[in-house]
């Protein structure tokens, strides 16, 4: 990762925010190449998810919204991470991300001040006392030593023994428990050093920790992996950035920077449905900034406090509605999503969930992430959010990912695809008092044709699902049963609350994954036998920041420069082009390889007609293998466009 981080700064992909003032942790700026890469990714996602589909429309919502939205979504009360602090350094940790450790825990019950003015030392005695104190850490051993010294025929040793006895009985002490974990192989003295630093910070001039006992532990997460010091008890830390709307900072004016883009989509669901002339199933997509006050931002841009999301909320019919209309629900296991034309009319939530998982993996492959670098991880039941029926995380094998028992990278999350049931729309209906259900004429007509047994069975299933949700949300039992019955009765009228499938991806994580995947090194030996390592970023042309570089062979030949500028201007309306005339042609190729530019277009003397048959042609060099071919200037744009789109 160090090489990638260095390259990103050196070539203008990513800078630390506010770097001239020391930086600010968890915030990053995108330089010229990074900004282009980011724009390309967002546009490709938007085109794939909205413009190339008839069933998805877009939304762009504000970053600050009514705080009631975050109350309804649960973010105000539950959007938190467990946080703990190192009791020695005050460094903060995510309690659930502390690395497990094995070793021996040393428990201390407090500390004495090792040197006291009450001793009344004679000259040279203080140093002798300190020498003995440092040798014997256990208080009982120290008392035993003092007793031995006090009966020594050497009067000086008698005085030292008396001074130590006086020390052990002093009242200048701290009775504050503390513990230190030592990994295997570390000497016990190291625990006393760390404990001494802890008690020194609590006002003791020269603390002498008092050990109570030790304990052998495995998989311990109660101590700082960096220094072994004890961590505080975990406590919830809300991740939302709080601010105020208007000139008065009062609780009435509290607002939050949005921690996700999804909730605005749910809040605007009815408006979009009514104005876009869509029908369920359909989706609403949004790309935008989100903010989370992470306890410990880590792994470069992977976990940041300001980031960008690409989210789709795809609204579908509940299974009971699908079954009422079509007579059955297509099992997800039987679904083959590779066909371009699919009959989705009988799809339930499992089929739609599987479809979106496979669609998203195909997207990642289409922009240059090999399938063998991706992991499809199905969350276990105990890992699911309370509202989710199923969630699949698409993981990428970053260099910093953990390794399994076989030594294989396990991957870190790029995107989650969650089947969120009807939780979100139901919550906003409850908190806003506004209906979030839809009317479906097809359902109303189909319901009237069902026999009574079928109606009763479907109504019962819908009632039980709604009752489960209402009970989980703390609605009083009698009221919950009444509301659930009313919801079930709504099926006969063609009314229901849509369910949601949510593919949610992080732009910044995807950028980092693409850079990691594209990074490669090539060792080249020159004519003098000197070997040099070059970096090539093998971006897929679709995402590459610069699509083509236009290079005149020589800078000091005006006719070459003029023709190169004409070629540049011809390509600019169609793609991002970079013009470079500085340095040897080999060095310019190397610079473009490092920037990830897939094509270099060289204007040479043959372009000008030195060889008449090659006039108005250029050399096009491909980044990954260095191969070149000759093309006419007039056909250049048409040759490049299919390769970069």
Question: Language-model segments: what does each one mean?
Answer:
Residues 1-645:
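NTP/phosphate- and nucleic-acid-binding module
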């Amino acid at each position: 990762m160090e090489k990638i981080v260095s390259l990103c700064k050196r070539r203008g992909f990513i800078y630390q925010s506010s770097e001239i003032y020391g930086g600010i942790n968890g915030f990053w700026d995108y330089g010229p190449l990074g900004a282009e890469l980011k724009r390309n990714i967002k546009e490709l996602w938007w085109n794939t998810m909205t413009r190339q589909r008839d069933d998805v429309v877009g939304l762009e919502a504000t970053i600050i919204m009514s705080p009631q939205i975050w109350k309804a979504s649960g973010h105000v009360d539950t959007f938190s991470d467990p946080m703990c602090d190192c009791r020695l350094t005050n460094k903060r940790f995510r309690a659930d991300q502390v690395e497990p450790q094995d070793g021996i825990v040393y428990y201390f019950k407090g500390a004495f001040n090792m040197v006291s003015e009450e001793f009344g030392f004679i000259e040279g005695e203080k140093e002798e006392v300190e020498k003995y104190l440092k040798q014997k850490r256990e208080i009982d051993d120290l008392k035993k030593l003092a007793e031995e010294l006090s009966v020594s025929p050497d009067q000086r040793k008698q005085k030292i023994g008396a001074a130590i006895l006086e020390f052990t009985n002093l009242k200048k002490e701290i009775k504050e428990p503390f513990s230190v974990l030592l990994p295997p192989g570390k000497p016990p003295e190291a625990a006393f050093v760390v404990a001494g630093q802890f008690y020194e910070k609590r006002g003791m001039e020269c603390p002498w920790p008092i050990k109570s006992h030790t304990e052998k532990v495995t998989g311990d997460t109660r101590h700082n992996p960096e220094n072994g010091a004890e961590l505080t008890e975990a406590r919830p830390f809300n991740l939302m950035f709080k601010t105020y709307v208007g000139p008065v900072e009062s609780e009435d004016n509290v607002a939050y920077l949005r921690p996700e883009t999804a909730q605005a989509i749910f809040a605007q669901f009815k408006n979009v449905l009514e104005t876009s002339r869509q029908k369920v199933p359909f989706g609403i997509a949004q790309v935008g900034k989100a903010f989370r006050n992470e306890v410990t931002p880590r792994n470069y841009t992977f976990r940041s406090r300001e980031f960008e999301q690409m989210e789709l909320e795809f609204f579908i019919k509940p299974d009971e509605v699908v079954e009422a209309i079509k007579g059955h629900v297509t099992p997800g296991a039987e679904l083959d999503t590779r066909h371009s034309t699919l009959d989705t009319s009988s799809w339930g939530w499992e089929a739609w969930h599987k479809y979106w998982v496979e669609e998203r993996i195909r997207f990642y492959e289409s922009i240059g992430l090999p399938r063998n670098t991706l992991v499809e991880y199905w969350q276990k039941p105990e890992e699911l959010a309370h509202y989710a029926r199923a969630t699949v995380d698409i993981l990428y094998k970053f260099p910093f990912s953990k390794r399994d028992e076989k030594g294989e990278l396990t991957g870190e999350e790029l995107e989650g695809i969650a089947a969120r049931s009807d939780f979100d729309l139901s919550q906003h209906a409850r908190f806003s008092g506004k209906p979030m259900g839809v009317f479906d004429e097809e359902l109303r007509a189909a319901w009237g044709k069902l026999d009574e047994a079928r109606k009763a069975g479907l109504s019962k299933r819908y009632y039980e699902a709604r009752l489960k949700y209402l009970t989980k949300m703390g609605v009083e039992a009698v009221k919950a049963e009444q509301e659930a019955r009313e919801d079930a009765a709504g099926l006969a009228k063609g009314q229901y609350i849509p369910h949601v499938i949510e593919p949610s991806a992080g732009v910044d994580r995807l950028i980092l994954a693409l850079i990691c995947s594209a990074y490669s090194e090539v060792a080249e030996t020159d004519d003098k036998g000197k070997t040099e390592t070059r970096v090539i970023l093998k971006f897929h042309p679709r995402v590459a920041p610069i699509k083509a570089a236009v290079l005149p062979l020589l800078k000091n030949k005006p006719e070459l420069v003029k023709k190169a500028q004409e070629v540049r201007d011809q390509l600019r309306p169609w793609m991002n082009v970079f013009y470079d005339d500085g340095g040897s042609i080999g060095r310019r190729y190397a610079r473009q390889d490092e920037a990830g530019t897939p094509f270099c277009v060289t204007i040479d003397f043959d372009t000008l007609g030195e060889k008449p048959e090659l006039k108005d042609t250029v050399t096009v060099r491909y980044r990954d293998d260095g191969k070149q071919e000759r093309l006419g200037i007039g056909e250049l744009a048409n040759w490049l466009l299919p390769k970069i789109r």
